[in-house]
C-alpha cells in the first residue's frame, strides 16, 4: 500500500512519545530510577497501550515512564538520535519530530533550554548518520499552564533557526487555545509555521479557534471536523491539512474503531489529509502498520492511501524547492 516511487513522510510524530521500551529500561538502570518492571517483557504493558485507553488524558499517562528516565541532557540527546534511527528503519524519507522540552525536563528539573539544544544535537547527528531528512516542531504543553508554555516558547525562540513550527498539545478541553494567543503571535513573528492539536478531545469549535485565532496552517488529529460541514468545506478550500493518526485515535477512544474514522470522508471531501503515527513508541506501531493495516481497515482504497501519501509531502513544512528535491531523490532510487 506504500508507493515506493513517492517520498514517505511522517509529519505528526512526537519525539517524546517514541522512546523505546529497551531505552527506558537501560536509562532506568543507568540512573538508578525505580521502574514498575525489571525486564523488557514485563515493562512493556506499563509503557505501551495494550488495550484502548478510555480517553486522551489516560493515554498520555503512558508517556510518563519515557520521560521519567530522562535524567540528563545526554539521555535527551540519545532518544532524539534514536528517533531518527527508528525513522530510517521505517523507510521514512522525511520526518517532522515534535517535542515538549518542559515535559522532557520535568522529572529531573533539567534546564528547558538545555533539552532543546540536546534534541537538536541528537537529531542532527542522526540525520548525518542515517540520511533521513528531519525538521523540528516545538510543542507547548498546554496541560502545565500558560507560564510553563511561555518558558518553552522562550527556549525555542533562543534557537529559532533550528525550529520550524510551533504546536500546542495536551489537555485540549481544560486549556483551550484562547489562553495562548500571545504565544502564537510571537511564533508567527518569528517566521514559524503553525500546527495545533485540535478537534481530538474537543469539538469543531476548537479547530475553528486554532485556525482563526492561532493561525494554524495544519491541524493535528482534527477528527471532530466531521461534525461541521462548513468547517470541512473551509479546510478543503483553504488547503488546511489534517494530520491524521489512525491507531492513536482508536487507542485514545477518540474514535470508536477504524471503520468509523473520518479520514476516508476527509479525503473524499477534498481535504488535504495525511497518514501519521503520533506516539509510535507508546502505541507499539510504526508508519508501515498505519499504511498497510490501519488505513485499509479505515476503508481507504489503494488510490486514497496513495493520495494521503502525496498529501504528507504537500503538507510538510518544506519549501517548494525542498519538496521537489525530495521527490527527485526518491524517484532516482
Swiss-Prot record:
Top EC class for this record: hydrolase
List of residues binding substrate: 14, 16, 170, 279
Catalytic activity: adenosine + H2O + H(+) = inosine + NH4(+); 2'-deoxyadenosine + H2O + H(+) = 2'-deoxyinosine + NH4(+)
GO CC aspect terms: cytosol
Residues engaged in binding Zn(2+): 12, 14, 197, 278
A Gene Ontology biological process term: hypoxanthine salvage
Cited PROSITE patterns: A_DEAMINASE
HAMAP family found in the cross-reference section: A_deaminase
NCBIfam families to which the protein is assigned, alphabetical: aden_deam, PRK09358.1-1
Function recorded in the entry: Catalyzes the hydrolytic deamination of adenosine and 2-deoxyadenosine.
Protein name: Adenosine deaminase
Species this chain originates from: Escherichia coli O127:H6 (strain E2348/69 / EPEC)
